[in-house]
Regions:
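Short juxta-domain linker segments that transition from a proline/glycine-rich
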Residues: 2-9, 16-20, 26, 30, ...
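Active-site signature of alpha/beta-hydrolase-fold catalytic machinery across serine-
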Residues: 41
Length: 501
C-alpha cells in the first residue's frame, strides 16, 4: 500500500471521527495541540502526524489509537479502499483538472457508504464491458482537450518560434510550407536522427505500424514505406515536436501497444498538435477558413483543395480546424471518425472530440447500431482508395429527430493505406445557431442534402416506411414504451383501488 493511500485513509478516518464527535476543526486542533491548517492537511491526506500527535487526536476523538491508525476500513467501505488503491486512481491526472486526489476524497467522505456503493457499481460496469485503464486515461485526455476547446496558445507560439528559428535555414515560413525533404533533413542535422523507410514494411509483425522510434544518443526513426508523403510529413513534424518541446515520456510507436501514464498520452497529443501547427500555420489556415465560410454557395472543391494546399490527410486538416475554429470564430463543433471493415455490418466510432454536446452513443461495448443516416456512416460503404485525388467530399445538414437540433456536417471517406479492407470516415460538424449563421454564408444552400437522424436504430421511432436503412428493430424504444405502459396501468390501479392504507 502506498504512503499516499495510508495518508488518505487516515485523513478520512480522522474527518469521520471528528464529525461523529461534533467537533470543529478548531476544536480538535486545540485539543490535539496542532494548528487548524495542519489538521486540514491531515484530513486531506497530504500529511501524516507523529505518533504523539495521533495519541492526542485519539483521546480528543474518543477513539482507540490502534483503530485510528489501522488501514482497515469497515466492510461497507471496502470498495472505497479498493478504488483508492487502484492504478487508475493513483495515475489519474487530477492536477490537469485543477484537482487533487484529496479533493475527490473530500466529496467521498461526506457520504462514504453511498460513495463506496457507487464506486462498486462503476467497477462492476467496467468489468462488464472490459474497460481498460487506458480507456479511462484516453477519456481524461479527451475531457482535458474539450475543457480547453482544443486550443493551446503555448503550442501555437512554440510552432511559430520554431519556424522563425529554423525556417530560414530549411526554406519554410508561414507562407512557404515545410516540405518532406526539409523536415527529414532538419531531423537529421539538428537532432542527429537516422531515418529508415524500409525495415518496417519488411517485418510482418511490424507492418501495421506507421512509425517506430528507438531512442538513444542517436535516435532511429523507422517509417513504413507504404505510407503516402503527406502521412510521412506529419510523422516527421510530430517527431520534431517531441524534441523541440523536450517531451520525454512518450509513445515509441504510432499506435502504442501500452499506455503507462496520462503524461504519455498528453505528450503524444502535444507533439501532434505542434506538428499540425507547423504544417498548417495558424494565420494561413484562418485566412483560408475565412474565405471558405464567406462563399455564397457550398463548393466542395474549395473544401477538398485545402488537402492539397497543405499536403495533409483529411484527419490532419479537420483536426487542425477543431483547434482554431472555436477559438477564432466562436463556433462549437465536433469531430467523429468511424471505421468499417469490408463485408461487415458493424461501424466503429474510433475517435471523437465533442465540444457541442452532440448526442453520440459512444460507450465502450455499445451493443446498438448507430443511425445509418449519419454522414459519417454514409461516407463509408463507397469510400475510395487513399490515393484518390481529389477525395470526394460529403456534406449534410442533419436534424435530430428527438430534439430538432441541427448540425452542418462535412468530411471525407477513404480506405486505410495499411489496411485497405478498412474504410475510414472523418467529419467535422457545427451546431446550427446564430453564431454559425453569422459566419457561414452557404449554410442555407439548397444543394446541401438534408436529413433527419437519430442516435441508434434501437432508440428510433421511425417506421420501416419512413426509414429504409434501419439496421436493427427499435428494441430499446419498445422496452421503454412497455415500461411506461406498466407504470400507467399501475397508476390507474392505485387510483381505482387505493393504496391499501
Amino acid at each position: 500500500m502506498s504512503l499516499d493511500l495510508i495518508n488518505i485513509i487516515f485523513g478520512m478516518k480522522v474527518r469521520q471521527a471528528r464529525l461523529e464527535a461534533g467537533l470543529t476543526l478548531t476544536d480538535l486542533a486545540r485539543q490535539a495541540e496542532m494548528s487548524p491548517s495542519y489538521l486540514t492537511e491531515i484530513e486531506k491526506g497530504r500529511k501524516y502526524p507523529r505518533a504523539d500527535k495521533i495519541v492526542k487526536m485519539a483521546e480528543a476523538l474518543g477513539k482507540p489509537y490502534d483503530d485510528l491508525v489501522s488501514i482497515r476500513l469497515a466492510p461497507s467501505l471496502r470498495q472505497l479502499e479498493t478504488t483508492l488503491s487502484s492504478t487508475t486512481m493513483q495515475r489519474f491526472p487530477f492536477e490537469e483538472f485543477g484537482l487533487e486526489p484529496a479533493d475527490v476524497l473530500g466529496l467521498i467522505t461526506r457520504e462514504p457508504e453511498r460513495a463506496s456503493a457507487l464506486l462498486h457499481a462503476v467497477v462492476e460496469i467496467a468489468r462488464r464491458y472490459d474497460l481498460r485503464e487506458e480507456e479511462f486515461l484516453r477519456a481524461a485526455l479527451r475531457s482535458y482537450q474539450e475543457m480547453h476547446e482544443n486550443y493551446f496558445p503555448d503550442l501555437e507560439d512554440a510552432a511559430l518560434r520554431f519556424s522563425a528559428e529554423f525556417g530560414p535555414r530549411y526554406g519554410f515560413d508561414e507562407t512557404m510550407l515545410p516540405t518532406l525533404d526539409a523536415l527529414s533533413t532538419l531531423l537529421r542535422q539538428e537532432y542527429d536522427y537516422t531515418i529508415d523507410d524500409r525495415a518496417l514494411a519488411n517485418i510482418e509483425e511490424l507492418r501495421a505500424f506507421r512509425s517506430l522510434v528507438l531512442p538513444g544518443r542517436r535516435p532511429q526513426l523507422f517509417i513504413n514505406s507504404r505510407l503516402y508523403a503527406r502521412q510521412v510529413k506529419f510523422i516527421l513534424a510530430r517527431e520534431i515536436g517531441y524534441r523541440y518541446l523536450s517531451l520525454k515520456e512518450r509513445s515509441l510507436t504510432s499506435t502504442p501497444d501500452r499506455v503507462d501514464s496520462f503524461q504519455q498520452l498528453l505528450n503524444d497529443a502535444r507533439a501532434a498538435y505542434f506538428g499540425g501547427a507547423l504544417l498548417m500555420p495558424r494565420g494561413r489556415v484562418l485566412a483560408d477558413l475565412q474565405a471558405f465560410f464567406a462563399l455564397p454557395a457550398w463548393e466542395p472543391g474549395r473544401f477538398s483543395a485545402m488537402l492539397t494546399t497543405y499536403g495533409v490527410t483529411p484527419e490532419m486538416l479537420l483536426y487542425r480546424f477543431s483547434e482554431l475554429i472555436p477559438e477564432f470564430f466562436g463556433i462549437k463543433l465536433h469531430i467523429l471518425r468511424f471505421h468499417h471493415t469490408a463485408g461487415s455490418d458493424e461501424y466503429h466510432l474510433v475517435r471523437h472530440l465533442n465540444m457541442n454536446q452532440l448526442l453520440v452513443p459512444s460507450g465502450i461495448g455499445l451493443l446498438e447500431h448507430h443511425c445509418r443516416r449519419w454522414l459519417s456512416i454514409r461516407l463509408l460503404p463507397d469510400a475510395p482508395g487513399a490515393a484518390a485525388d481529389p477525395l470526394p467530399v460529403g456534406v449534410q445538414l442533419s436534424e435530430f429527430l428527438s430534439t430538432q437540433e441541427q448540425f452542418l456536417c462535412m468530411g471525407f471517406g477513404r480506405r486505410m493505406v495499411l489496411s485497405p479492407q478498412v474504410a475510414s470516415s472523418v467529419i467535422i460538424g457545427f451546431r446550427v445557431d446564430a453564431d454559425l449563421r453569422a459566419t457561414v454564408r452557404f449554410l442555407d444552400d439548397p444543394n446541401i442534402p438534408r436529413d433527419i437522424i437519430h442516435e441508434t436504430c434501437e432508440r428510433c421511432p421511425l417506421t420501416p416506411e419512413q426509414c429504409t436503412v434501419r439496421a436493427a428493430p427499435p428494441a430499446l424504444l419498445e422496452a421503454r414504451r412497455e415500461q411506461m405502459a406498466r407504470k400507467l396501468a399501475l397508476s390507474q390501479l392505485q387510483a381505482r383501488y387505493g393504496t391499501g392504507d
